[in-house]
Amino acid sequence: MSGSEEEHLVSLTFRKNEEDMDEDEGKVKQKEKPKEKQMEFVNQNFVESTEDESEVSTPTAVGLPIGTSTPDGDETPTQPDPNGKYTMAQTKDADLSRPSGLPSNGNPGSSTTVPPASKSGPVAPPRPSGTPVAPQRNRRRKVTELKCSEVRWFFQEPKGTLWNPFNGRDSIMLEIKYRKEKGIELDEAMQEIYDESLTHYKMEMKDEPEIENGNIGMEQEKPMVVVMNGQYKVNKDNSKIDPIYWKDDSKEIRRGSWFSPDYQPLEMPLSDQIEKNHLQCFRNQMIPEGTTVFSKSETSNKPVLAELHVDGYDIRWSSVIDISLHQKGNAILRYLWAKSTPLRRGYEKEADWNDAAAEISHLILVVHGIGQKGYENLIAQNANQVRDGVVSAMEKVYPEEKSRPMFLPVEWRSALKLDNGLTDNITIPKMSSMRASLNSTAMDVMYYQSPLFRTEIVRGVVSQLNRTYKLFKANNPQFNGHVSVFGHSLGSVICYDVLTQYSPLMLFDKYVTKSIDEYLKRDDTNASEEARKALEAMKLAREQLRDNLEGGIHKLLVTKEEQLEFKVKYLFAVGSPLGVFLTMRGGESTDLLSKATNVERVFNIFHPYDPVAYRLEPFFAPEYRHIRPIKLFSNTDLRARASYENLPLDVYKHYLKKLKNLNKAKKNKDDKTADARSGGDDENEDEDECDSDEDARSGCSSPRSMTPPPFETAAANAAAAAKETKAVKKGWFSFGTSSNPKKTQSTASLGSVNATSTENIEFAKEAAEELPLAEKILGSGVRVPHRIDFQLQPALTEKSYWSVLKSHFAYWTNADLALFLANVLYCKPLKPEEAKPTWA
């Protein structure tokens, strides 16, 4: 072909052709339309310089001649101009999705043989089978502004590197807020959602002035959009989310419209510029299917239809969907490091309004105890740990349950002034670290015992409880579930006092009244007649005050600042010293669960090695000290998924042995032998706390075995457990001492071993009668209305000093406790015919 013919071919104008293809018959029809007015332009963003050939992509012809129609009926838009730059000829509905017909070397002056168009019109080459399929939303769509659902918002943890997507509803709410403030029109679907569900947020345009009292431009108060299950609120400039119920846990957020191949969002300024240029160049162009329009052989020779230079990056368009990001630099650096990164427009999955957090059916307020001074955010982490454990347990045990509980932290220590640092001033400087630790932990207990600081602590806790509840209700107005309190350590004591409206002044009032009565009864007093009459009048006035004042004198002592504004269903006292506090107050069973108690039920949950925890059931009857607390089954045990309400009473093993020895002593009339053989109760009590669950009573208290052992093998199991216990039990707290089980076994006589086996066999047979025996032990004394004490199971390795120290803080991540909480909150009451335990 001569140069004049080539020049004539290159200068041909594009003609608009419309093509209708019949897929069944394989026929193609073409119709010509009058040529519309063409507008040629040269855009710097569409220019590929030929000076540096290392930067120039040299696409080859892809089978379509210049000036012919694409399968969609649009002309190929790319042609070289006489100046050596690519020129875009726009026509109505021009399709820039795939460039074609470029010279093989990318040089407009080179000679290229271009095949003539067939009479039936050009046919697009078949798409490679390995080409990824684009999302459904990209099929047969034109390039327009992204819908709200195509944009996805992300958050990043403070020390994280990855961006995590919000759920569909949170992302839509953030995008609607963003567009309302920017004055960007919502698409039809999002406008409908806004009108139905989000009008109460009153999202205003950012630049809209407010006219009030003659002041123009006063910034309006932005609505508080809450995300992440209602625990975080969005700041005014949509750059981060701040926690609502605790402090110092802000997370950066980012609006994602353009993404890397792994769908990590680009920075918002860069994304906005790319989006603006993309719409300017490709608006109303058809979006083809797949993630690229080029085959594997063509990827190295992609043309550059448009280019954008932003902050050290080059963004290049090879088609509507083939966009790549390049780092700037010289040719060597680009060759070594700066490989192009494909970009994706719109998130891989559209946001769905129904993709929301589970409905909240129960609110649990988590109150910390001692040791929080200087660690204000620790309780927030602990509350999240408990919630994660409960949710994980519910996914396994209650997969059909759609709702979830919400655990919110209540941090009360940092807001208190107490002695204004006087304790720190009087602390001896020697061993300062240890003394500072004691001041931040043990001093909280002493503060609470002080009549001077106790009121400040109680009011501080009540204030934070009410504040958290009000915030939650404001952010979740549809919530109508129950509220419970999870109190740890000293926090459980404070919450119990708040719920029972206990005041130490009541105890003081009783003491004063008793002193007056004793004084008036004495005859040897030197008080005058007038003084005696004044005391009698005071006593009578106090009695009338109790009788006539609604609520009695108690109402005068307990102020409004010490009362909750909501009803509490459950109190979970975890690792609680409540028992010893009640003992120091002279408490009785009537005081433990009085009529004034503003709670439905109390659960006293403790670890057997926790030095701070105490039992509560012996308050009702001293005989309960012989009854075991309910042992929580392991979370891997099938029995842990059933209710604990129907478990029989379980008597301590050491007490059973003591009764058996006493009975033998009575038969043999040998009191000395009975005394000798009934000794060592402390050692047996330790055995009770960590005995093997494979004994005869495992049907009542076994926490680890999946199924209870048959009664026929219980005796053998008990004997084996006894041998193992004797070998391991020695040195429970003995460090640095040597223990030789083989030596111990060799020194034991065969007769003693046989006697031990016989005793365990007899003991296993007696275990079947534990329930009636427990009833006999309790007799006609006061009974608990429901079981209160619940004991966690220690791990096999938790027999050391360190285990004792850390057991008080091991509740937050305990899986057995998490499953128990889930059962209490969501387990449905059993019918009478189902009341029998499934493992019985």
Swiss-Prot record:
- Do you know which SMART domains this protein is assigned to? DDHD
The reply to whether Lipid metabolism figures as a keyword in the UniProt entry is: yes
The way its activity is modulated is described as: Inhibited by E-6-bromomethylene-3-1-naphthalenyl-2H-tetrahydropyran-2-one (BEL) in vitro.
Q: Ranges of Low complexity compositional bias?
A: 97-111
Instruction: Enumerate the catalysed reactions.
Output: 1,2-dihexadecanoyl-sn-glycero-3-phospho-(1D-myo-inositol) + H2O = 2-hexadecanoyl-sn-glycero-3-phospho-(1D-myo-inositol) + hexadecanoate + H(+); a 1,2-diacyl-sn-glycero-3-phospho-L-serine + H2O = a 2-acyl-sn-glycero-3-phospho-L-serine + a fatty acid + H(+); 1-hexadecanoyl-2-(9Z-octadecenoyl)-sn-glycero-3-phospho-L-serine + H2O = 2-(9Z-octadecenoyl)-sn-glycero-3-phospho-L-serine + hexadecanoate + H(+); 1,2-di-(9Z-octadecenoyl)-sn-glycero-3-phosphocholine + H2O = (9Z-octadecenoyl)-sn-glycero-3-phosphocholine + (9Z)-octadecenoate + H(+)
* Compositional bias per record (Acidic residues), positions renumbered to this chain: 681-694
Q: Is-annotated flag, keyword Hydrolase?
A: yes
Locate the region Disordered.
Answer: 1-142, 666-718
Give the UniProt record's GO annotations in the biological process aspect: phosphatidylcholine catabolic process; phosphatidylinositol catabolic process; phosphatidylinositol metabolic process; regulation of asymmetric cell division; regulation of protein localization
CC annotations in GO: cytoplasm; cytosol; endoplasmic reticulum; nucleus; phosphatase complex
Q: Keyword annotations for this protein?
A: Hydrolase, Lipid metabolism, Phospholipid metabolism
Q: Which domain of life is it from?
A: Eukaryota
The family note in this entry says:
Belongs to the PA-PLA1 family.
Q: What is the role of this chain?
A: Hydrolyzes the ester bond at the sn-1 position of glycerophospholipids and produces 2-acyl lysophospholipids, being phosphatidylinositol (PI) its major substrate. PI is a versatile lipid that not only serves as a structural component of cellular membranes, but also plays important roles in signal transduction through distinct phosphorylated derivatives of the inositol head group. Catalyzes the hydrolysis of phosphatidylcholine at sn-2 position in vitro. Regulates asymmetric division, an important property of stem cells in C.elegans, by controlling the subcellular localizations of beta-catenin.
Q: What is this protein called?
A: Intracellular phospholipase A1
- Which gene name does the record give? ipla-1
